Amino acid sequence: MAQQPESETAQPTIRRFRRELLDLVRRATLNLLTSAVTVAISGCLGPPVLERQVLGYDEVTRMLDEKLLLLNIARVSNQEPVHFTSTSSIAATFNWTATLGASGEVTESKGTNFLNLNIGGSASENPTFSISPVSGKEFTERVATPFQDTIFEFLVFQGGKINQAMRLMSAGIEVQKPDGRFVRFIENDPQRPKEYEEFRQIAAHLQWLNDNRQLFVRPLVFDETLIADFKSTPSAGDINNGFNMGLRWRQKPNGNYELTRLKGGRVVVSNFDPMALTDQERAALDEKIKKNPSGFVYLDIEPNGPGGNLPIQGAIKLRSMFQILNFIATGIRIAPEFEVSPNLPTEETDVGATATLKINVTDSPPDLRLPTVYYDGHYYSVNDTVWDRTTFLILSILFQTTIGRIENVGIPITISK
């Protein structure tokens, strides 16, 4: 038998090697394509779901706080007790998966090639809510205790209108003598028209001073003496340790030493700069102011200063959170506020809206953009003006400072979806 040429014998082996190499390349290409598409699907599916859900929960929490405020205003307007509930925690587990399958038939010879590609993705969430009824002695005391003067100063310092903060937070102005003795009270209540009108005029006057950069709203700062006359020389360790604690040693003219620390005192509203006073005068003024509770903001408009044509000395008495809600609710039907003209027509300033915070009560739903709650067959919503929306924002801030951190709740209500 004749021997075949070597080239003819090697042809099947070469073709088989080529087929195996081609199959290997095709499988590697399919695996690479499958992995790339799967990663792409996972990357596109997960982050948008997480973003939407986190922002969605945040928006729902904000709306709940708004509705809770309006709900309690509606309750008080109907002579019903207030009640607060807080969503103390929201925990959600997110799960997203992506699948990709590829199969087919690829022929080396001429013909039709078949390729099937299956792509799938899914996302799920399992939220758990903890709803805590806000109650107890501690919270009741916070709701019924007047706000401190530092809260009032914070709102004004952040750029808020002082007349807006006063109308919302203040129960009135206590006029006092220079030694702090009581003279009379100017109540911020439309049921006392003359006092209410005078209060509004004083608030507008303070706003005019503030608009013209002639009103100072700040805490008193002064050096508090801890050791008045230290006869020895303090050691280097005492000086360094004191410096780290905000203490300062200072040598007196007689050679002895004095130990002081910088202290922030009570808040003052005045038409003069408290820093222009001496350190001893600021300390003495703080001692005088401390005779009033922390819910009083010291007020001193001197006759010889800017705006001295309407002098007054006393204190702005702040409301509690419950008193603020009651004031707004009473203004809906029982004692609505009325328009007041400035006491001094020459002072061009915005006296503000007629109502501190106007709450509209309607039978039909208002604009969806407005904070609204449905209660007892009516819709309670914030009036659609810049003034009312700003006042409601201030009220929301005060509400958050009142609630604080929810702790030691006896029976939280947990809902798992």
Language-model regions: role of each:
Residues Q3-Q4, Q11:
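Low-complexity, intrinsically disordered or signal/transmembrane-proximal segments
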Residues S7-E8, R15:
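Alpha-helical and His/Cys-centered functional microenvironments
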Residues F17, L21, R26-L30:
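N-terminal export leaders
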Residues T34-V37:
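Classical Sec-dependent N-terminal signal peptides that target proteins to the secretory pathway
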Residues A40-G43:
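C-terminal motif of bacterial Sec signal peptides marking the signal peptidase cleavage site
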Residues L45-K417:
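N-terminal amphipathic/basic membrane-interacting segments and domains
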